[in-house]
Amino acid sequence: MTDAPPIIRLRHLRKEFDGTIAVADLTLDVAEGEFICFLGPSGCGKTTTLRMIAGLERPTAGEIWLRERRIDPLPPQQRGVGFVFQNYALFWHMSAYDNLAFGLRVRGVSPAEVDARVREVAESLELTPVLRQRASRLDLSAMQRVALGRTLVVQPQVLLLDEPLNNFRPGLREVMRGELKRMQLSLGRTMVYVTHDQEEAMTMGDRVLVMHEGRVEQVATPREIYRRPATLFVAGFIGRPAMNFIETQYQVEDGRAFLRHDALRWEIETRREAVERQAPSGRVIVGIRPEDIRPAVLAVPEGRRGETLPVQVDLVQPLARRKIVDVKVLDLVLKMVVPGTFRVDAGQTLDVVMDRGALHLFDPQTLRAIG
Amino acid sequence: MTRMVTESTPSPVTVAPPVPARLYVAGALRLAVAAGIALIFFLPVLWMLSISFKPPAEWLEYPPTLWPKEPLAGNYTFLFNPGNPEGAIAVMTGAAEPVVPAFANSLVVAPLATLLSVTIGFLAAYAVSRFHVGGTFMPFFTLTTRMFPPVAFAVPLLLYYSAVIPRLIPGLRLYDTRLGLILMYVAFTVAFALWMTKGFIDAVPRHIEEAAILDGASRWRVLFTVTVPLVRGGLAATTLFIFILTWTEFLFALIFTQRFAITVPVQVSHYAGAIGRFYGPQAALGILASIPVVVTGYLIQRHLVTGFTFGLVRE
């Protein structure tokens, strides 16, 4: 992030379709050169937001600014943004060259200049050898580069990408992801990237905007999103396996603050003030990531060690380098992750500790994080 | 650009590996089966071809033979000059007019009606597919109009053509004119054209058109530079289908023409006389009438086979 003025500013953006709200009230600044990912389940409004920036949808309310220009009243071609579609949406019947030249020709650029600019972009994307090939005959990597090149050739200030890797098989996706990221770094272009794949967003984005039901849940760096989810939705959406949630009641015993669920309790003296202020009802949802519940025999830093808790192992799912273990305690089923080398079998009891520093607290009314 | 996946240049030549013998056998078997099926479908055509070269005495032979014993071209010359048949075909008296006007009529009516129908149907299909014009029920409604038996329309339409139109628009003649037939055929085939082309348009991802719109291309430009090329296989198939339909249409051609606008299918029915049906000239005309359809099919077969190469990534 730089101190330079933001390149894109969205102000109270709203979009309704026939009475249903697709985007409720979205305000966002995107910095020059930033790679920002819009992440959320399908139907959350992320693609609609992207299409509003591009000019494919007209906002019901709100403003879109590109640098010093308000662009939401402008037709798409005057906005200075490029759009890369799902599956690339190339003109399959045209050559790679004609795909790249299309935008310039529509804009009435002279043939000589069209040729010069197409060749320049083709050179930078290593497309020169395949310029004469039909788009439908290109390999996937070349298709991706043509899709990018087609938008770059008209020199957009911002690139918008709508789930460009959506329908590629796993494996290829990762290759393409790396290639895209490299391209972004070398082009230094601001990119807004829509995806429903958290791994994609978390690995590629400088920042991630998590959306849910038309609302922004959180905008932050991937690390921040993972470590300090701002809402219950983000906490449950980010991370695999998903975070465990436990309903608790705030109590003070002997002058010390606890969150209690049945016979389980967590001391939260350091966050007492925040809980009392933000959850006056005393009801708190405790979230803990599976990777923060560990077998007691494996070390947790002494100061952060919670109480040792005997649990019943219910199910063990071995993955390549780790195991996902379902454990039962009281009426709860919790997921935990242990190293692949750790021996554990269904039916046995296991002493576990929870990393006290890794507890996430949420208000069940507002669904927002506490503290 | 730092590093890039570099398999983008395809290897120029791929050498086919040697084909194992059992694949040859399988191929030969497949070919034999295909040839057998083709023969079954082609048999009527061969029979017609054979009869078109047979003299009247051999037309009704039983069992039928494929090769004429005394082949002659008389059936064909009779089509063009039915005035006074001579020699082996001298018995074919008291019949038809020359075939040329009917052919001329058909060659005007069918292609024009096809062109109009496919153009209108395609544009309508585009509106339905992309802008949902007419709502969800409209496309189906257009098809239901084709569920009426045409004969139910025939007489009211005949009255409309001969009694109403001349009063409403003096000077416009639709009965027994090429224009009248063309309008009729367009009206009756446009629903098919709409339905066939709609399927192909639906298969073109909207995003491809949006990509062009983002560059500032007008709707018409998008339509003609992006959509039409992508559905040309479908347009070709639709064109051929509608052309066959109109080229061979009989009922309306029979009812709505009398002398001047007679088409080939009606002409085929005219070959009868003192000795009964003139199967030879009918067969000869059947052969000639097949030629435009075959030629049309041949001309557009390239487009029929190509078409959907963009099934590479799913939408």
Positions of PLM-derived features:
Chain A
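ABC ATPase nucleotide-binding domain helices that frame the ATP-binding cleft
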Residues: 47-50, 146
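Conserved ABC transporter NBD signature motif
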Residues: 62-70
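Glycine/charge-rich catalytic "coupling/switch" loops of P-loop NTPases
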Residues: 227, 256-258, 262-314, 342-371
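ABC ATPase nucleotide-binding domains
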Residues: 76-82, 86, 90-233
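Helix-to-loop junction immediately C-terminal to a conserved catalytic motif
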Residues: 54
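ABC ATPase nucleotide-binding domain
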Residues: 9, 29, 65, 351-353
